[in-house]
Amino acid sequence: MAAQRTYLAIDLKSFYASVECVDRHLDPLTTNLVVADASRTEKTICLAVSPSLKAYKIPGRARLFEAVQRVKEVNAQRLQTAIRQKKAVRGEDGQYHFASTSFDANALNADPALGLSYIVAPPRMQRYLDVSTQIYKTYLKYVSPADIYPSSIDEVFIDVTGYLPYYHMSAHELAMTMVREVLYNTGITATAGIGTNLYLAKLAMDIVAKHIPADKDGVRIAELDEQSYRYLLWNHRPLTDFWMTGPGTVKRLEAHGIYTMGDLARFSIHGEDRLYEIFGVDAEILIDHAWGCEPCGMEQIKSYKPSTNSISEGQVLSTPYPYDKAKLIVREMAEILMFRLTEKKLVTESITLEVGYDRENVDKGGYRGLTQTDRYGRTIPKAAHGTVRFDAPTNLGSTIINESAKLFERITDPALTVRRITLNANKVTPDEGIYQVDFFTDTKKLEKEKKLQQAMLGIKNKYGKNAVLKASSYEEGATMRQRNAQIGGHSAGGSDGKLQK
Protein backbone atom coordinates (compact mmCIF):
# COMPACT_ATOMS: atom_id res chain seq x y z
CA MET A 1 0.00 0.00 0.00
CA ALA A 2 1.35 3.43 -0.99
CA ALA A 3 2.39 5.71 1.84
CA GLN A 4 -0.05 8.48 2.70
CA ARG A 5 0.90 11.79 1.12
CA THR A 6 0.44 15.32 2.40
CA TYR A 7 -0.51 18.24 0.17
CA LEU A 8 -0.77 21.98 0.68
CA ALA A 9 -3.04 24.35 -1.18
CA ILE A 10 -2.12 28.02 -0.77
CA ASP A 11 -4.31 30.91 -1.92
CA LEU A 12 -3.23 34.55 -1.80
CA LYS A 13 -6.00 36.52 -0.12
CA SER A 14 -7.78 38.90 -2.55
CA PHE A 15 -4.50 38.93 -4.47
CA TYR A 16 -4.99 41.79 -6.95
CA ALA A 17 -6.59 44.00 -4.30
CA SER A 18 -3.83 43.17 -1.81
CA VAL A 19 -1.12 44.14 -4.30
CA GLU A 20 -2.85 47.48 -4.92
CA CYS A 21 -3.13 48.14 -1.18
CA VAL A 22 0.50 47.25 -0.44
CA ASP A 23 1.74 49.43 -3.31
CA ARG A 24 -0.21 52.31 -1.79
CA HIS A 25 1.29 51.58 1.67
CA LEU A 26 -2.16 50.60 2.94
CA ASP A 27 -3.21 47.56 4.97
CA PRO A 28 -4.79 44.97 2.61
CA LEU A 29 -6.98 43.63 5.43
CA THR A 30 -8.53 46.95 6.46
CA THR A 31 -8.56 49.02 3.26
CA ASN A 32 -11.76 49.17 1.20
CA LEU A 33 -10.62 48.72 -2.39
CA VAL A 34 -11.84 47.18 -5.64
CA VAL A 35 -9.75 46.43 -8.71
CA ALA A 36 -11.77 47.46 -11.74
CA ASP A 37 -11.36 49.46 -14.92
CA ALA A 38 -13.81 52.26 -14.26
CA SER A 39 -12.91 53.83 -17.62
CA ARG A 40 -14.97 51.13 -19.36
CA THR A 41 -18.42 51.33 -17.76
CA GLU A 42 -19.91 50.52 -14.36
CA LYS A 43 -20.84 47.15 -15.87
CA THR A 44 -17.17 46.17 -15.82
CA ILE A 45 -16.27 43.23 -13.58
CA CYS A 46 -14.39 43.85 -10.34
CA LEU A 47 -11.31 41.65 -10.65
CA ALA A 48 -10.86 41.70 -6.89
CA VAL A 49 -12.52 43.10 -3.78
CA SER A 50 -10.56 43.63 -0.57
CA PRO A 51 -11.59 41.56 2.50
CA SER A 52 -12.93 44.54 4.45
CA LEU A 53 -15.19 45.54 1.55
CA LYS A 54 -16.35 41.93 1.10
CA ALA A 55 -17.59 42.15 4.69
CA TYR A 56 -20.39 44.39 3.34
CA LYS A 57 -21.64 41.45 1.24
CA ILE A 58 -19.95 42.54 -1.96
CA PRO A 59 -18.84 39.39 -3.82
CA GLY A 60 -15.33 39.05 -5.19
CA ARG A 61 -16.41 39.12 -8.85
CA ALA A 62 -19.21 41.68 -8.69
CA ARG A 63 -19.92 44.15 -11.43
CA LEU A 64 -18.74 47.63 -10.47
CA PHE A 65 -22.30 48.97 -10.44
CA GLU A 66 -23.24 46.26 -7.93
CA ALA A 67 -20.47 47.43 -5.60
CA VAL A 68 -21.55 51.05 -6.08
CA GLN A 69 -25.16 50.17 -5.27
CA ARG A 70 -24.26 48.16 -2.19
CA VAL A 71 -22.09 50.99 -0.81
CA LYS A 72 -25.00 53.39 -1.35
CA GLU A 73 -27.24 51.06 0.67
CA VAL A 74 -24.69 50.84 3.48
CA ASN A 75 -24.19 54.61 3.51
CA ALA A 76 -27.94 55.22 3.67
CA GLN A 77 -27.97 53.30 6.97
CA ARG A 78 -24.78 54.93 8.25
CA LEU A 79 -26.11 58.40 7.43
CA GLN A 80 -29.12 57.79 9.67
CA THR A 81 -26.68 56.97 12.47
CA ALA A 82 -24.73 60.16 11.77
CA ILE A 83 -27.95 62.18 11.91
CA ARG A 84 -29.00 60.60 15.21
CA GLN A 85 -25.56 61.32 16.68
CA LYS A 86 -25.74 64.88 15.29
CA LYS A 87 -22.55 64.32 13.33
CA ALA A 88 -24.08 64.84 9.90
CA VAL A 89 -23.99 68.22 8.17
CA ARG A 90 -26.82 69.89 6.26
CA GLY A 91 -25.80 71.12 2.84
CA GLU A 92 -27.06 74.07 0.81
CA ASP A 93 -29.52 71.67 -0.78
CA GLY A 94 -31.07 71.10 2.63
CA GLN A 95 -30.03 67.45 2.63
CA TYR A 96 -27.89 65.80 5.27
CA HIS A 97 -24.40 64.64 4.27
CA PHE A 98 -21.51 62.92 6.00
CA ALA A 99 -19.10 65.24 7.73
CA SER A 100 -16.35 62.83 6.74
CA THR A 101 -15.78 59.50 5.02
CA SER A 102 -13.12 56.81 5.23
CA PHE A 103 -11.94 53.76 3.29
CA ASP A 104 -10.33 52.27 6.41
CA ALA A 105 -12.30 49.53 8.19
CA ASN A 106 -10.84 50.34 11.62
CA ALA A 107 -11.92 53.98 11.38
CA LEU A 108 -15.37 52.98 10.13
CA ASN A 109 -15.84 50.49 12.95
CA ALA A 110 -14.72 53.04 15.53
CA ASP A 111 -17.09 55.74 14.26
CA PRO A 112 -20.44 54.52 12.85
CA ALA A 113 -21.18 58.09 11.72
CA LEU A 114 -18.41 58.05 9.11
CA GLY A 115 -19.36 57.52 5.48
CA LEU A 116 -18.08 54.40 3.77
CA SER A 117 -15.75 55.13 0.87
CA TYR A 118 -13.49 52.93 -1.22
CA ILE A 119 -10.69 53.06 -3.74
CA VAL A 120 -11.22 51.95 -7.35
CA ALA A 121 -7.82 50.75 -8.58
CA PRO A 122 -7.36 50.15 -12.31
CA PRO A 123 -5.92 46.69 -13.00
CA ARG A 124 -2.15 46.31 -13.54
CA MET A 125 -1.76 42.76 -14.77
CA GLN A 126 1.99 42.95 -15.32
CA ARG A 127 2.49 44.03 -11.71
CA TYR A 128 0.41 41.09 -10.47
CA LEU A 129 2.43 38.67 -12.59
CA ASP A 130 5.67 40.11 -11.19
CA VAL A 131 4.49 39.75 -7.57
CA SER A 132 3.19 36.24 -8.27
CA THR A 133 6.61 35.29 -9.66
CA GLN A 134 8.29 36.72 -6.56
CA ILE A 135 6.01 34.65 -4.32
CA TYR A 136 6.57 31.50 -6.38
CA LYS A 137 10.32 31.94 -5.87
CA THR A 138 9.66 32.06 -2.12
CA TYR A 139 7.97 28.66 -2.30
CA LEU A 140 10.93 27.31 -4.27
CA LYS A 141 13.20 28.09 -1.31
CA TYR A 142 11.42 25.25 0.50
CA VAL A 143 10.36 22.77 -2.21
CA SER A 144 11.45 21.57 -5.64
CA PRO A 145 9.66 22.76 -8.81
CA ALA A 146 8.69 19.11 -9.37
CA ASP A 147 6.53 19.23 -6.22
CA ILE A 148 4.65 22.45 -6.88
CA TYR A 149 1.82 23.14 -9.31
CA PRO A 150 0.60 26.72 -9.87
CA SER A 151 -3.10 26.35 -10.69
CA SER A 152 -3.54 30.10 -11.18
CA ILE A 153 -1.73 33.40 -10.62
CA ASP A 154 -2.69 33.34 -6.92
CA GLU A 155 -3.00 29.64 -6.04
CA VAL A 156 -0.60 26.70 -5.84
CA PHE A 157 -0.65 23.05 -4.83
CA ILE A 158 2.44 21.57 -3.16
CA ASP A 159 3.30 17.96 -2.33
CA VAL A 160 5.15 18.35 0.97
CA THR A 161 5.31 14.65 1.86
CA GLY A 162 9.08 14.32 1.58
CA TYR A 163 9.85 17.70 3.13
CA LEU A 164 8.22 17.20 6.52
CA PRO A 165 10.88 14.81 7.88
CA TYR A 166 13.61 16.85 6.17
CA TYR A 167 12.60 20.08 7.94
CA HIS A 168 11.44 18.27 11.11
CA MET A 169 8.14 20.11 10.80
CA SER A 170 4.47 19.25 10.73
CA ALA A 171 2.51 20.21 7.62
CA HIS A 172 0.93 23.06 9.57
CA GLU A 173 4.33 24.38 10.64
CA LEU A 174 5.75 24.24 7.10
CA ALA A 175 2.67 25.93 5.65
CA MET A 176 2.87 28.67 8.26
CA THR A 177 6.60 29.15 7.61
CA MET A 178 6.05 29.68 3.88
CA VAL A 179 2.98 31.87 4.33
CA ARG A 180 4.80 34.03 6.91
CA GLU A 181 7.74 34.57 4.56
CA VAL A 182 5.37 35.59 1.76
CA LEU A 183 3.73 38.05 4.15
CA TYR A 184 7.10 39.42 5.28
CA ASN A 185 8.40 39.85 1.72
CA THR A 186 5.26 41.16 0.03
CA GLY A 187 2.77 42.25 2.69
CA ILE A 188 0.22 39.80 1.25
CA THR A 189 -1.70 37.38 3.45
CA ALA A 190 -2.46 33.82 2.35
CA THR A 191 -4.88 31.07 3.31
CA ALA A 192 -3.69 27.45 3.30
CA GLY A 193 -5.32 24.05 3.26
CA ILE A 194 -3.68 20.76 4.21
CA GLY A 195 -5.02 17.45 2.96
CA THR A 196 -4.16 13.81 2.43
CA ASN A 197 -4.95 14.36 -1.26
CA LEU A 198 -5.22 17.36 -3.58
CA TYR A 199 -9.01 17.49 -3.36
CA LEU A 200 -9.04 17.62 0.44
CA ALA A 201 -6.28 20.25 0.50
CA LYS A 202 -8.37 22.40 -1.82
CA LEU A 203 -11.52 22.01 0.29
CA ALA A 204 -9.63 22.66 3.51
CA MET A 205 -8.50 25.95 2.00
CA ASP A 206 -11.74 26.95 0.23
CA ILE A 207 -14.36 25.88 2.79
CA VAL A 208 -12.98 24.90 6.19
CA ALA A 209 -10.44 27.71 6.55
CA LYS A 210 -13.17 30.31 5.96
CA HIS A 211 -14.92 29.19 9.14
CA ILE A 212 -11.97 29.30 11.54
CA PRO A 213 -10.58 32.40 13.27
CA ALA A 214 -7.68 34.15 11.56
CA ASP A 215 -4.50 34.95 13.44
CA LYS A 216 -3.32 38.53 13.98
CA ASP A 217 -2.06 38.71 10.38
CA GLY A 218 -5.24 37.33 8.85
CA VAL A 219 -3.70 33.91 8.16
CA ARG A 220 -5.95 30.83 8.24
CA ILE A 221 -4.73 27.24 7.89
CA ALA A 222 -7.11 24.26 7.96
CA GLU A 223 -6.58 20.50 7.64
CA LEU A 224 -8.66 17.60 6.30
CA ASP A 225 -8.28 13.87 5.93
CA GLU A 226 -10.92 11.41 4.70
CA GLN A 227 -12.51 11.00 8.14
CA SER A 228 -12.59 14.67 9.15
CA TYR A 229 -13.91 15.51 5.66
CA ARG A 230 -16.91 13.25 6.22
CA TYR A 231 -17.48 14.67 9.70
CA LEU A 232 -17.13 18.34 8.73
CA LEU A 233 -18.39 18.53 5.16
CA TRP A 234 -20.79 15.69 4.43
CA ASN A 235 -23.68 17.97 5.46
CA HIS A 236 -22.23 21.18 4.01
CA ARG A 237 -24.34 23.18 1.60
CA PRO A 238 -24.37 24.44 -1.10
CA LEU A 239 -22.78 21.73 -3.22
CA THR A 240 -21.37 24.39 -5.56
CA ASP A 241 -18.80 25.18 -2.85
CA PHE A 242 -17.10 21.90 -3.69
CA TRP A 243 -14.31 21.75 -6.24
CA MET A 244 -15.46 20.77 -9.76
CA THR A 245 -19.17 20.72 -8.83
CA GLY A 246 -20.87 23.37 -10.93
CA PRO A 247 -24.49 24.57 -11.03
CA GLY A 248 -25.44 22.18 -13.85
CA THR A 249 -24.13 19.16 -11.96
CA VAL A 250 -25.82 20.29 -8.75
CA LYS A 251 -29.16 20.74 -10.52
CA ARG A 252 -29.06 17.15 -11.79
CA LEU A 253 -28.04 15.83 -8.38
CA GLU A 254 -30.85 17.69 -6.62
CA ALA A 255 -33.33 16.26 -9.12
CA HIS A 256 -32.48 12.88 -7.57
CA GLY A 257 -32.75 14.08 -3.96
CA ILE A 258 -29.00 14.59 -3.52
CA TYR A 259 -28.27 17.87 -1.70
CA THR A 260 -25.01 17.16 0.14
CA MET A 261 -21.84 15.14 -0.36
CA GLY A 262 -23.11 12.81 2.35
CA ASP A 263 -26.27 12.25 0.30
CA LEU A 264 -24.14 11.51 -2.76
CA ALA A 265 -21.90 9.06 -0.90
CA ARG A 266 -24.87 7.15 0.47
CA PHE A 267 -26.61 7.16 -2.92
CA SER A 268 -23.49 5.74 -4.58
CA ILE A 269 -23.58 2.61 -2.41
CA HIS A 270 -26.61 1.21 -4.22
CA GLY A 271 -27.11 3.73 -7.05
CA GLU A 272 -23.69 3.78 -8.70
CA ASP A 273 -25.08 2.56 -12.04
CA ARG A 274 -27.68 5.32 -12.02
CA LEU A 275 -24.98 7.95 -11.45
CA TYR A 276 -23.07 6.64 -14.47
CA GLU A 277 -26.28 6.84 -16.53
CA ILE A 278 -26.67 10.49 -15.54
CA PHE A 279 -23.06 11.71 -15.64
CA GLY A 280 -21.18 9.19 -17.76
CA VAL A 281 -17.50 8.83 -16.91
CA ASP A 282 -17.69 11.96 -14.71
CA ALA A 283 -19.63 9.87 -12.19
CA GLU A 284 -16.35 8.32 -11.08
CA ILE A 285 -14.99 11.72 -10.06
CA LEU A 286 -18.21 12.63 -8.24
CA ILE A 287 -18.25 9.36 -6.30
CA ASP A 288 -14.57 9.64 -5.38
CA HIS A 289 -15.06 13.20 -4.16
CA ALA A 290 -18.17 12.29 -2.19
CA TRP A 291 -16.03 9.87 -0.16
CA GLY A 292 -13.09 12.32 0.08
CA CYS A 293 -10.91 10.40 -2.37
CA GLU A 294 -8.73 11.77 -5.18
CA PRO A 295 -6.45 9.33 -7.04
CA CYS A 296 -4.53 11.99 -9.00
CA GLY A 297 -1.30 13.27 -7.48
CA MET A 298 1.26 15.89 -8.44
CA GLU A 299 2.77 13.84 -11.27
CA GLN A 300 -0.62 13.26 -12.90
CA ILE A 301 -1.80 16.88 -12.82
CA LYS A 302 1.53 18.11 -14.15
CA SER A 303 1.44 15.66 -17.06
CA TYR A 304 -2.24 16.18 -17.90
CA LYS A 305 -2.98 17.35 -21.43
CA PRO A 306 -6.50 18.00 -22.72
CA SER A 307 -7.73 15.51 -25.29
CA THR A 308 -8.65 18.29 -27.70
CA ASN A 309 -6.52 21.35 -28.27
CA SER A 310 -7.80 24.75 -29.28
CA ILE A 311 -6.79 28.39 -29.03
CA SER A 312 -9.39 31.08 -28.55
CA GLU A 313 -9.80 34.84 -28.63
CA GLY A 314 -12.80 36.50 -27.06
CA GLN A 315 -13.90 39.93 -26.02
CA VAL A 316 -16.87 41.80 -24.64
CA LEU A 317 -17.21 45.08 -26.51
CA SER A 318 -17.47 48.26 -24.46
CA THR A 319 -20.59 49.38 -26.36
CA PRO A 320 -22.99 47.73 -28.81
CA TYR A 321 -21.24 47.52 -32.19
CA PRO A 322 -23.04 47.78 -35.54
CA TYR A 323 -22.44 45.09 -38.15
CA ASP A 324 -19.52 46.73 -40.03
CA LYS A 325 -17.57 47.63 -36.88
CA ALA A 326 -18.12 44.16 -35.45
CA LYS A 327 -16.75 42.67 -38.67
CA LEU A 328 -13.60 44.78 -38.20
CA ILE A 329 -13.21 43.32 -34.70
CA VAL A 330 -13.52 39.78 -36.08
CA ARG A 331 -10.72 40.49 -38.58
CA GLU A 332 -8.54 41.89 -35.79
CA MET A 333 -9.18 38.87 -33.57
CA ALA A 334 -8.42 36.51 -36.45
CA GLU A 335 -5.10 38.31 -36.96
CA ILE A 336 -4.23 37.93 -33.28
CA LEU A 337 -5.15 34.25 -33.50
CA MET A 338 -2.91 33.89 -36.56
CA PHE A 339 0.08 35.39 -34.74
CA ARG A 340 -0.50 33.15 -31.71
CA LEU A 341 -0.52 30.08 -33.94
CA THR A 342 2.60 31.28 -35.75
CA GLU A 343 4.45 31.93 -32.49
CA LYS A 344 3.60 28.49 -31.12
CA LYS A 345 4.37 26.83 -34.48
CA LEU A 346 0.85 25.43 -34.69
CA VAL A 347 -1.77 25.05 -37.40
CA THR A 348 -5.54 24.73 -37.15
CA GLU A 349 -8.06 22.62 -39.03
CA SER A 350 -11.04 24.96 -38.57
CA ILE A 351 -12.32 28.18 -37.07
CA THR A 352 -15.46 28.55 -34.95
CA LEU A 353 -17.08 31.96 -34.47
CA GLU A 354 -19.75 32.93 -31.95
CA VAL A 355 -21.39 36.34 -32.11
CA GLY A 356 -23.42 37.51 -29.10
CA TYR A 357 -25.96 40.25 -29.69
CA ASP A 358 -26.71 43.14 -27.35
CA ARG A 359 -29.86 43.29 -25.22
CA GLU A 360 -30.81 46.65 -26.80
CA ASN A 361 -32.00 44.74 -29.87
CA VAL A 362 -34.84 43.32 -27.75
CA ASP A 363 -35.34 46.34 -25.49
CA LYS A 364 -36.03 48.65 -28.44
CA GLY A 365 -38.83 46.38 -29.62
CA GLY A 366 -39.38 45.08 -33.10
CA TYR A 367 -37.13 42.01 -32.78
CA ARG A 368 -39.09 38.83 -33.49
CA GLY A 369 -36.32 36.26 -33.83
CA LEU A 370 -35.12 33.51 -31.50
CA THR A 371 -34.05 34.59 -28.02
CA GLN A 372 -32.07 33.30 -25.07
CA THR A 373 -31.55 34.37 -21.46
CA ASP A 374 -28.20 35.79 -20.34
CA ARG A 375 -26.58 35.17 -16.95
CA TYR A 376 -28.57 38.06 -15.44
CA GLY A 377 -31.90 36.67 -16.59
CA ARG A 378 -32.30 39.24 -19.38
CA THR A 379 -33.74 38.34 -22.78
CA ILE A 380 -31.32 38.79 -25.69
CA PRO A 381 -31.29 37.58 -29.31
CA LYS A 382 -29.94 34.06 -29.68
CA ALA A 383 -26.21 34.13 -30.42
CA ALA A 384 -24.98 33.29 -33.92
CA HIS A 385 -22.63 30.33 -34.20
CA GLY A 386 -20.74 28.79 -37.10
CA THR A 387 -17.63 26.89 -38.17
CA VAL A 388 -15.50 26.92 -41.30
CA ARG A 389 -13.15 24.04 -42.10
CA PHE A 390 -10.02 24.50 -44.15
CA ASP A 391 -8.83 22.28 -46.98
CA ALA A 392 -5.69 21.63 -44.95
CA PRO A 393 -4.41 22.69 -41.49
CA THR A 394 -3.06 26.25 -41.69
CA ASN A 395 -1.81 29.28 -39.79
CA LEU A 396 -1.70 31.63 -42.78
CA GLY A 397 -3.32 35.00 -42.19
CA SER A 398 -4.73 35.22 -45.71
CA THR A 399 -6.79 32.12 -44.98
CA ILE A 400 -7.69 32.60 -41.32
CA ILE A 401 -8.56 36.31 -41.51
CA ASN A 402 -10.51 36.17 -44.76
CA GLU A 403 -12.40 32.99 -43.88
CA SER A 404 -13.29 34.38 -40.44
CA ALA A 405 -14.70 37.52 -42.09
CA LYS A 406 -16.72 35.41 -44.55
CA LEU A 407 -18.02 33.29 -41.69
CA PHE A 408 -19.11 36.45 -39.86
CA GLU A 409 -20.97 37.62 -42.96
CA ARG A 410 -22.68 34.24 -43.28
CA ILE A 411 -23.96 33.84 -39.72
CA THR A 412 -24.49 37.40 -38.43
CA ASP A 413 -27.71 39.39 -38.71
CA PRO A 414 -26.64 42.81 -40.10
CA ALA A 415 -29.67 44.47 -38.49
CA LEU A 416 -28.53 43.64 -34.95
CA THR A 417 -25.86 45.22 -32.78
CA VAL A 418 -23.11 42.99 -31.37
CA ARG A 419 -21.73 42.85 -27.81
CA ARG A 420 -19.65 39.64 -27.57
CA ILE A 421 -17.36 37.88 -30.04
CA THR A 422 -15.48 34.61 -29.55
CA LEU A 423 -13.20 33.07 -32.16
CA ASN A 424 -11.72 29.58 -31.73
CA ALA A 425 -8.98 27.81 -33.66
CA ASN A 426 -9.95 24.14 -33.42
CA LYS A 427 -7.84 20.96 -33.40
CA VAL A 428 -4.50 22.75 -33.38
CA THR A 429 -1.48 20.58 -34.15
CA PRO A 430 2.26 21.18 -34.67
CA ASP A 431 3.14 22.87 -37.95
CA GLU A 432 5.02 20.29 -40.01
CA GLY A 433 5.56 22.75 -42.86
CA ILE A 434 3.61 20.54 -45.27
CA TYR A 435 1.03 22.06 -47.65
CA GLN A 436 -1.81 20.31 -49.41
CA VAL A 437 -1.24 21.59 -52.95
CA ASP A 438 -2.73 21.20 -56.41
CA PHE A 439 -1.76 22.53 -59.82
CA PHE A 440 -3.12 25.97 -58.94
CA THR A 441 -1.30 26.40 -55.61
CA ASP A 442 1.49 29.00 -55.61
CA THR A 443 3.81 27.42 -53.02
CA LYS A 444 6.31 30.28 -53.33
CA LYS A 445 3.57 32.73 -52.39
CA LEU A 446 2.64 30.61 -49.37
CA GLU A 447 6.26 30.47 -48.21
CA LYS A 448 6.62 34.22 -48.68
CA GLU A 449 3.50 34.87 -46.59
CA LYS A 450 4.72 32.56 -43.83
CA LYS A 451 8.14 34.27 -43.72
CA LEU A 452 6.42 37.68 -43.61
CA GLN A 453 4.28 36.55 -40.66
CA GLN A 454 7.37 35.33 -38.82
CA ALA A 455 9.21 38.59 -39.53
CA MET A 456 6.27 40.66 -38.24
CA LEU A 457 6.07 38.46 -35.17
CA GLY A 458 9.78 39.02 -34.51
CA ILE A 459 9.30 42.79 -34.68
CA LYS A 460 6.31 42.63 -32.34
CA ASN A 461 8.20 40.50 -29.82
CA LYS A 462 11.17 42.86 -29.86
CA TYR A 463 9.47 46.26 -30.01
CA GLY A 464 5.97 45.56 -28.71
CA LYS A 465 2.75 44.24 -30.20
CA ASN A 466 1.78 47.66 -31.55
CA ALA A 467 5.05 48.07 -33.47
CA VAL A 468 3.43 46.70 -36.64
CA LEU A 469 -0.26 47.29 -37.27
CA LYS A 470 -2.61 47.37 -40.21
CA ALA A 471 -4.22 50.69 -41.12
CA SER A 472 -7.61 49.22 -40.16
CA SER A 473 -6.48 49.07 -36.53
CA TYR A 474 -6.58 52.89 -36.50
CA GLU A 475 -10.20 53.01 -37.64
CA GLU A 476 -12.91 54.13 -35.23
CA GLY A 477 -14.05 51.22 -33.09
CA ALA A 478 -10.94 49.09 -33.61
CA THR A 479 -9.68 47.51 -30.39
CA MET A 480 -6.39 45.81 -31.32
CA ARG A 481 -4.13 48.62 -30.13
CA GLN A 482 -5.87 48.70 -26.76
CA ARG A 483 -5.94 44.90 -26.41
CA ASN A 484 -2.25 44.66 -27.29
CA ALA A 485 -1.54 46.70 -24.16
CA GLN A 486 -3.51 44.27 -22.00
CA ILE A 487 -2.79 40.98 -20.25
CA GLY A 488 -5.69 38.54 -20.04
CA GLY A 489 -8.06 41.21 -21.36
CA HIS A 490 -7.14 43.72 -18.64
CA SER A 491 -4.73 46.62 -18.45
CA ALA A 492 -1.09 45.68 -17.92
CA GLY A 493 -0.65 48.99 -16.07
CA GLY A 494 1.81 50.43 -18.56
CA SER A 495 4.98 48.87 -19.90
CA ASP A 496 6.50 48.85 -16.43
CA GLY A 497 3.30 48.03 -14.54
CA LYS A 498 3.71 51.13 -12.37
CA LEU A 499 1.04 52.40 -10.02
CA GLN A 500 -1.16 54.99 -11.68
CA LYS A 501 -1.36 58.22 -9.76
Annotate each PLM feature.
Residues M1-D288, P295-M298, T443-K501:
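Gly/Gly-Pro- and Ser/Thr-rich, intrinsically disordered tail segments characteristic of DNA damage-repair
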Residues A2, A9, D241, P247-T417, ...:
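DNA-contacting surface of Y-family translesion DNA polymerases
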Residues K13-F15, S39-K43, Y357-V362, V428-D431:
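Short, charged/polar surface micro-motifs in flexible loops or helix N-caps
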Residues D27-T30, V34-A38, D324-A326, P393, ...:
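Compositionally biased, low-hydrophobicity segments enriched in charged and small polar residues
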Residues T196-Y199, D288-W291, V347-R359, T417-T429, ...:
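A glycine-rich phosphate-binding loop feature that marks nucleotide/adenosyl-phosphate handling sites
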